[in-house]
Amino acid sequence: MSFDFRIPRRTLLKGIGAAGLGTALGAGGIRPLYAKGLAPITIVVNQSPWFESFRRTVEAYEAATGNKVELDVNPFAGSLEKQRNSVRSARGQYDILIMNSGWFAEMYAGGFVEPITDIDPGFKLDPEVYTLGDTIYYNAQKKTVTADGKLMSIPVSPLIPMLYYRGDLYKQAGLSAPKTFAELEANARKFHKPPGMYGIVQRGARGPHTVAYDFYPYLYGFGGGIFKDQSAGDYSVTLNSAQGREALDYYIRLARTAGHPKTAASDQAEVIQAMVTGHAAHIMMVIAAWSQMDDPNKSVVVDKIEWAPPPSAPGLPTAPGLGHWLAGISRNVPDDRKRAAVEFLRWFQTKDAQLETAKAGGIPVHAAVYKEPIADERKYRWMKPLAQALPNAVNIYQFPEASEVIAVLEIGLNRAVAGEISSVDALNGMADEIHKVMNRNAYKSGALQPLK
């Protein structure tokens, strides 16, 4: 089911303090004033945990400028379908597309998104906005998502997985947040007392982007990867490297020795449920779930959860996989709506607008917000760890056919976690299938020797 609704203009917004926001943003933003009296715009967006904060930020924009915004709200798959239909029509229905990390490359490579600086050559990206693996840029000539390309979008929600852990248990045991995988494993085993308490609960279920997404911090944190160098156009498959084997062996061992017995059937809802009901000492979960931990209507561990960047192997940085959202402007809409969309993005990227996003429960895309007093408040204790992790976030896919690779990973990883096949067979099999995908789509690719 989808929801079409026009957000009303307000002169005063309860709970968000938007009265006077236009003046404040004008004083501290990129431009002294934001354009008013623009054409109304329509944004197609998905119904996600962060949507409410986005909606309230849009309301603040309307109050500050008087400009009108309509939100077309849909389930995850429904949003993608509507975007695909709109960009392929003679005249687009949606001015701003809220694109997920799994499909933004499709929109860039297909020429469906207009570069922001082509619409307004004077547009400047705020230097403190996270570029999230440079995924806001696209070099059409090289077909790469790299900073030498044009500015295609502005980040909306910089989602990455973080380590959620029971701070109260850590305090009692005299432990500090784990920085290495060895420390995480030792701590998970220490707290593992099933069925009342599991050392860690992981996702292992097969889905549209489920077990694969949870595996990325381990794969890249051990120094592995799926491809050799996407930014250079080298799609040689490296999944079945020694590092890849170490990562998958670790993931499976963690599940079997300190995890839930039904890891292979666990999806996001089950993982979150284990944490909020007090049955998990650790989970690796997208940061958007933070508010559920302190919601007394859902959680028995209110004020007991802490956050840390995902661990990594010694000498390597944390490597959370991006699962973020970007806002791009559709190419097939009238020029006046394109210009109005640019003004919204110009406003949205500012520190002041992003501070309002944080106050509304969202995840800011502006680095300066994480240095504000709000980050020292107990309620927002996740902000500083997130700020540490974001600069190291990994863009997993830079090509339009990513869904074909994800489907291969979902099957192979799920079977390995379930014990149906060995990690070696899983990695070799997935690598072979991914190599076929890349060859079929005419990418420069290669393969490693199979693991023994």
Question: Predicted regions span which residues?
Answer:
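Extracytoplasmic "Venus flytrap"/periplasmic binding protein-like
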Residues: 36, 60-137, 168-179, 274, ...
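Short, solvent-exposed loop/beta-turn-alpha elements that line the ligand-binding surface or hinge
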Residues: 117-136, 204-205, 222-246, 295-300, ...
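Long, aromatic- and glycine/proline-rich binding clefts that accommodate carbohydrate-like moieties
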Residues: 35-37, 130-131, 135, 305-310, ...
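Hinge/lid segment of periplasmic solute-binding proteins
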Residues: 102-160, 211-214, 304-308, 377-378
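Extracytoplasmic/periplasmic solute-binding protein
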Residues: 29-30, 141-156, 161, 185-236, ...
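N-terminal secretory signal peptides
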Residues: 1-11, 18-20
